[in-house]
Amino acid sequence: MKNVLPPFIEIYRALIATPSISATEESLDQSNASLITLLAGWFSDLGFNVEVQPVPGTRNKFNMLASTGHGAGGLLLTGHTDTVPFDDGRWTRDPFTLTEHDNKLYGLGTADMKGFFAFILDALRDVDVTKLKKPLYILATADEETSMAGARYFSETTALRPDCAIIGEPTSLQPIRAHKGHISNVVRVLGQSGHSSDPARGVNAIELMHDAIGHIMQLRDSLKARYHYEAFTVPYPTLNLGHIHGGDASNRICACCELHMDIRPLPGMTLNDLNGLLNDALAPVSERWPGRLTVAELHPPIPGYECPPDHQLVEVVEKLLGTKTDVVNYCTEAPFMQTLCPTLVLGPCSINQAHQPDEYLETRFIKPTRELITQVVHHFCWH
């Protein structure tokens, strides 16, 4: 199937020109169907079998799995098709027009991370994929930037068990083998309103929340003291109070107070255990004020992730790149892929470009990224 694809830069241009924004706000959220159609056509042209998978619980979002080869094992290359929304007033270029300037390619998704699929396609354009000795899978997921619904659903429903996977998130080609998780909760306190001239006739939700926050801070200190992973720049689980709102007037007893908080657990800490620790921390308040305090998820939680440092994937990639793997504090889809096979996070561009105005790919990443994909496909699918 040689040379059936457009040139690399035109593939990149087409990906950036196809909007696929994910947002919790319905007015900003977009389907990724057009982008999936583009990718499905190109991978079909290369000889892959292509399956498009609707993702339940989303607004018309899809995963795409392109596969070739038979048998067990093989390699999975994966990434997400969606981008974050953009702030029109802060971009100096059209986010959906690939712009080349000063050794950079500008556009929404150039770094995070639609452009990774252009690298995969370009690396495979001259490969007869029907002759690979082990399977090669390409997965394009939906909604990573909001719920990670695509990766969650794929990992829960697929029977595939590749030998290993690489997620092409922007890491400046520094291989990542572990990251923290993310839990985002809302704590709600329901009081009883009344006139401020007689506080005893009501229940002040702000005062109850003040008590709850004291117990949450004790949990924060306990997490810091009990759990450590020295490879991380912040080597303990973090707990952050991000948003609070309560009451509506200075002369009313506050009837409702709401606190948004997050916890970033280390690899190996289970989500159930953390939820249990939070509930235990708040138990004294709940017992003192029955039925007035609740805890709920703001977003579906993401567990921490770790690829075994002695796995063949780590050894091969470290040798190819001449560098050691690292760990990071941010989250990716790796915990879900790791349930299928050992997984690394590794791709072009810097994470510092993600979610920024005038997002860009430095062209110095083009050649080494193409070479890396070619080498890992050769190692894991030809041998």
Curated annotation (Swiss-Prot):
Cofactor binding summary note: Binds 2 Zn(2+) or Co(2+) ions per subunit.
Residues annotated to bind Zn(2+) 1: H80, D112, E169
Record GO terms (molecular function): acetylornithine deacetylase activity; zinc ion binding
Keyword Secreted: no
Major location category of this protein: cytoplasm
Keywords on record: Amino-acid biosynthesis, Arginine biosynthesis, Cobalt, Cytoplasm, Hydrolase, Metal-binding, Zinc
Catalytic reaction(s) noted: N(2)-acetyl-L-ornithine + H2O = L-ornithine + acetate
Cofactor: Zn(2+); Co(2+); glutathione
PROSITE patterns associated with the record: ARGE_DAPE_CPG2_1 (PS00758), ARGE_DAPE_CPG2_2 (PS00759)
Enzyme type, top EC level: hydrolase
Known role: Catalyzes the hydrolysis of the amide bond of N(2)-acetylated L-amino acids. Cleaves the acetyl group from N-acetyl-L-ornithine to form L-ornithine, an intermediate in L-arginine biosynthesis pathway, and a branchpoint in the synthesis of polyamines.
Name of this protein: Acetylornithine deacetylase
Origin species: Salmonella typhi
Lineage: Bacteria, Pseudomonadati, Pseudomonadota, Gammaproteobacteria, Enterobacterales
